[in-house]
Amino acid sequence: MQKLIVKGKKKLSGTIKISGSKNATLPILAATLLIDKNITLKNIPFVQDVFTMINLLKFIGVNIQVFKKKNILKVSNNKKLKTVAPYNLLKTMRAGILVLGPLLARYRKAKVSLPGGCAIGTRPVNLHLFALEKLGAK
């Protein structure tokens, strides 16, 4: 293993702000489907996939308030939600499949189109389907 040794007479100190992660935000947003209370999410990176997931959740019936300048989302889904996620909302994002599990858990049924997204290698959804089958989904 290589090392990086820093020698100096000045002590390093300070703080930096770490931006939020898209790959953490998308599953957290999908998981909000399981909760029927108000949720505040902070340090949200407002990138295209996050906006696509917001639009998908809004279509399903989730109330989402976006506070872009503060990187905050306020999520509320205390009403009956749709159990369908159409292709036109999933075609540009792989993470759309993540709403399938929470919708199945909450409503015992869901119809989610296969996701689109970029073609970086193979990223099949069969593992999601296999896991849901093992949990009793048909």
Question: Residues of each region from the PLM?
Answer:
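Structural preference for solvent-exposed beta-strand-turn elements
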Residues: 1-138
